[in-house]
Swiss-Prot record:
Role according to the record: Involved in the export and assembly of the F1C fimbriae subunits across the outer membrane.
Major place of residence: membrane
Keyword field contains DNA repair: no
PROSITE patterns: FIMBRIAL_USHER
Alphabetic keyword roster: Cell outer membrane, Disulfide bond, Fimbrium biogenesis, Membrane, Signal, Transmembrane, Transmembrane beta strand, Transport
Disulfide bonds: 852-874
Annotated transmembrane regions: none
Species this chain originates from: Escherichia coli
Protein location: Cell outer membrane
Lineage: Bacteria, Pseudomonadati, Pseudomonadota, Gammaproteobacteria, Enterobacterales
Topology versus the membrane: Multi-pass membrane protein
Signal peptide: 1-38
GO molecular function annotation: fimbrial usher porin activity
Protein name: Outer membrane usher protein FocD
InterPro entries: Fimb_usher, Fimbrial_membr_usher_CS, FimD_plug_dom, PapC-like_C, PapC-like_C_sf, PapC_N, PapC_N_sf
Length: 875
């Protein structure tokens, strides 16, 4: 028997696997060290001690194990641990451990800055506020009643601090000290697509599009740029065009929980109509606020007769639980669940008595929690993607503030040379009646013909959640505008009406055509809203619609969508209806569709490994207003071990309508890989044939080189596990480390803990990782690095001899790569990640004579073996 990494005792008979390499993993029988160490209690002494003769007749054959009598499993040093404070996970970080004052155990050394970041109120702890922020202090000596427990096996540090010394922080709060601005890095995101279309007469047209998003991160600054290229060619023509879309520079202003943006951006559209602009903006960022304080939820007040447990439920789910002291209480950190639903509050007193009451509530977009302020300040010049509008300068400011009893006040101002607008509104949570908001905007505008107009616009929003029926009703806009009301974008037009396009022959004015047409004489008058039921357990019924009328004409925009989605076991089906009519459109579009999907797993055993298990059959039928009907049947699913190859095959028939009858067909493949995504497909309908293709991905340049990835999101995580090539990342389709051990997780959640785990089942036989899980908390737009401690090399069962005898049992063996282990009987020790040749140091006591070093050398063929054996002499 011998000891493996981390002081675990292993039996050489428990090793399994061949020496031929491959994917076989070694399995070890892990037994606690204490099982093999005799502990004898002397009647004459109160302390415990190890009797070495229990292990060997020769005491010199056993190392000094007295430290184990004190529970000291590790020597003092720095260890990466998961920190739990009052049973709540806080963070994962390196912590300095030193011997406790009684010399019996390892104690964490924490600075006042660290304790404050964890939620300890440094001003409530006597003397703590006078200490330098980086002073190393003992928790239980600084805070009366505080305790700690270090779980060496799971590398967890459990801390308890009396509530008296804790800050009043919301649930889910992560201190800004833990936010990671990431590393310096350059980013490139690309998305290329193309297709070739051939018609009945043999004509061919080619189209291509490329979007490039580039970026640079330095500290807390983020620079981004967005550019596109388009290409089209056919018989007798060819055209390609580069277009710059936007560029901006941004950073967080942590103290204000806001973001500063300079360059091309857009205004918030919650009070005034949103517009694109080039300038500067400072605006609140709700992502910096804990989840328990985002959105709107009511503040719950009450009185606890004694120490009681409070439980809050919504729609049958418990969303909050805590223990309350006697007296009045206030709860303002409930996680919002949807946009409403009655809250059932239960207080169970220590004597068994129970208080129960309901808090009905609903929310509309403008509602804020009590005491919460949300603002946005913008200034710059208007930007339009076309050539029909000017670029007038403006300044805009909006504000919302939550008041007690469910009230919210909000408003804003918009100032420009040709435009002035002011808004004032109020919102209210009315309990079982729902939530409502009402605001008014007064505007003064000067149009392109130099005419001046004054007008008002009134907006009413309503929301009611019917918990009993699972229905969420929203009347989003009844908005009424007087004839003289115009928006800021209306004043930017160069002409009063029309539509113009830029061609090779210059600007051409054309006649009105569907939604391309604009006419400032037909400004919006009134519009109304939406009815949106919520999801049920196995089905959803939805109905939504809108209606918009205009001054100066009886034409209207209309839209209606209705549908029913349901599932029976794993068979799903849906029935949907759509109606749309634009004011300048001659016809109304109406479409009715039916769709059913049946997975092949419906007929398979639950433990089936067939490739058809991830496949489904689908049938759909559509009917349009002008008589065209289409039927399609097909097959779709995923392949490969990570389900990262998707496929779809469809065949159908179209009849009626303007184009007569024809057969249709469609086939496609979509691949998601660690280095990018690729797609290809073919379709035919009537006399047209189309071949299309696409390629997308990202490139990240950092201090350690270039790493390819799937398309990049706003916030990224760079996985760094040197030498651990081709290792999968858990819960990431198609993402695995490259040949160097690097990978990019293309998406991460801002200001929240992101857990990144490596799939150890995909590790190579010559790779060991100390920490398979890393947690990071990135700021917006950051590229944060998740570092893993890897040991790459040979797994060795080494027999260490000294002066012809095995080194003492329990000796600590340390390799040059930082790995350590404990020698078992016969001087055997298991070490991983070892080079073919090197040196190890051995220590079995506190004296200078109680240590030695050993050189070893393995044959080259050991690199391909699961476990190698070697004997080394220690001097």
């Amino acid at each position: 028997m011998f000891f493996g990494d981390g002081g675990q005792l292993l039996s050489d008979k428990s090793l399994t696997g061949s020496a031929g390499g491959g994917n076989n993993r070694m399995k070890f029988n892990i037994l606690p060290l204490a099982f093999f160490i005799g502990i004898i209690v002397s009647p004459a002494r109160a302390e415990l001690y190890f009797n070495r003769r229990f292990l060997s007749d020769d005491p010199d054959a056993v190392a000094d194990l007295s430290a184990f009598t004190q529970g000291q499993e590790l020597p003092p040093g720095v260890y990466r641990v998961d920190i739990y404070l009052n049973d709540t996970y806080i963070s994962t970080r390196d912590v300095q451990f030193q011997m406790s004052q009684d010399g019996k155990q390892l104690a964490p050394c924490l600075s006042p800055e660290h304790m404050s970041a964890m939620g300890v109120n440094r001003y409530a702890v006597p003397g703590m506020e006078r200490l330098p922020a980086d002073t190393c202090t003992s928790l239980n000596s600084m805070i009366q009643g505080a305790t700690f427990r270090f779980d060496v096996g799971q590398q967890r540090l459990y801390l308890t601090v009396p509530q008296l010394y804790m800050s009043n922080q919301a649930r889910g709060y992560i201190a800004p000290e833990y936010w990671d601005n990431g590393i310096t890095a350059a980013l490139l995101n690309y998305d290329f697509s193309g297709n070739r279309v051939r018609d009945t007469y043999g004509g061919t047209s080619d189209y291509a599009y490329l979007n490039l998003k580039t970026g640079l991160n330095i500290g807390s600054w983020r620079l981004r740029d967005n550019t596109s290229w388009s290409y089209s060619a056919g018989k007798g023509y060819s055209q390609n065009n580069w277009q710059h879309i936007n560029t901006w520079l941004e950073r967080d202003i942590v103290s204000l929980r806001s973001r500063l943006t300079m360059g091309d951006s857009y205004t918030r559209g919650d009070i005034f109509d949103g517009v694109n602009f080039r300038g500067i903006q400072l605006a609140s960022d709700d992502n910096m606020v804990p989840d328990s304080q985002r959105g709107y939820a009511p503040t719950i007040h009450g009185i606890s007769r004694g120490t009681s447990r409070i439980s809050i439920r919504q729609n049958g789910y418990e969303i909050y639980q805590s223990t309350l002291p006697p007296g009045p209480f206030e709860i303002n950190d409930i996680y919002p669940a949807g946009s409403g639903g009655d809250l059932q509050v239960t207080l169970q007193e220590a004597d068994g008595s129970v208080q129960r009451f309901n808090v009905p509530w609903s929310s509309v977009p403008v509602l804020q929690r009590e005491g919460h302020l949300k603002y946005a300040l913008s200034a710059g010049e208007f930007r339009s993607g076309g050539h029909q509008q000017d670029n007038p300068r403006f300044a805009e400011g909006t504000l919302k503030y939550g008041l007690p009893d469910g009230w919210t006040v909000y408003g804003g101002a918009w100032i420009a040379e040709r435009y002035r607008a002011f808004n004032l509104g109020v919102g209210k949570n009315m309990g079982w009646l729902g939530a409502v908001s009402l605001d008014a905007t007064r505007a003064n505008a000067r149009l392109p013909d130099e005419s001046r107009h004054d007008g008002q616009s009134y907006r009413f929003l309503y929301n009611k959640s019917l918990t009993e029926t699972g229905t969420n009703i929203q009347l989003i806009g009844y908005r009424y505008s007087t004839r003289g009301y115009f928006t800021f974008a209306d004043t930017a037009w160069k002409k009063m009406s029309g539509y113009s396009v830029l061609t090779q022959d210059g600007v051409i004015q054309i006649q009105p055509k569907y939604t391309d047409y604009y006419n400032l004489a037909y400004n919006k008058r009134e519009g109304a809203g939406e009815y949106q039921p919520a999801d049920g357990e196995s089905s959803t019924l939805y109905l939504s619609g809108s209606h918009q009328s205009y001054w100066g004409t009886d034409r209207t925009d209309r839209q209606l969508n209705a549908g029913f989605n349901s599932s029976v076991n794993d068979i799903s089906w849906s029935l949907n209806y759509s109606l749309s009519r634009n004011a300048w459109q001659h016809e109304t579009d109406r479409i009715l569709s039916f769709d059913v999907s049946i997975p092949f797993s419906h007929w398979m055993r639950s433990d089936s490994t067939s490739a058809w298990r991830n496949a489904s059959a689908r049938y759909s039928q559509t009917l349009e207003a002008h008589g065209q009907a289409a039927s399609t049947a097909g097959l779709y699913g995923t392949l490969l071990g990570d389900n990262n190859l998707g496929y779809s095959i469809q065949s159908g028939y179209t009849r009626g309508g303007y184009e007569g009858s024809s057969k249709t067909g469609y086939a496609s493949l979509n691949y998601r890989g660690g280095y990018g995504n690729a797609s290809a497909g073919y379709s035919h309908s009537g006399g047209y044939r189309q071949l299309y293709y696409g390629l997308s991905g990202g490139i990240l340049a950092h201090a350690n080189g270039l790493t390819l990835s799937q398309p990049l999101g706003d916030t990224l995580i760079l996985v760094r596990a040197p030498g651990a090539s081709d290792t999968r990342i858990e819960n990431q389709t198609g993402v695995s480390t490259d040949w160097r051990g690097y990978a990019v997780l293309p998406y991460a959640t801002d200001y929240r803990e992101n857990r990144v785990a490596l799939d150890t089942n995909t590790l190579a036989d010559n790779v060991d990782i100390e920490n398979t899980v890393v947690s990071v908390v990135p700021t917006h737009g950051a590229v944060v690095r998740a570092d893993y401690k890897t040991r790459v090399g040979v797994k060795v069962l080494m027999t260490l001899m000294r002066n012809g005898k095995a080194v003492p049992f329990g000796s600590v063996v340390t390799a040059r790569n930082g790995g350590s282990s404990i020698a078992g009987e016969n001087g055997q020790v298991y070490l991983s990640g070892m080079p073919l040749s090197g040196q190890v140091s051995v220590k079995w006591g506190s004296q200078t004579t109680d240590q030695c070093t050993a050189d070893y050398k393995l044959p080259k063929e050991s690199a391909g073996q699961i476990l190698s054996h070697v004997t080394a002499s220690c001097r």
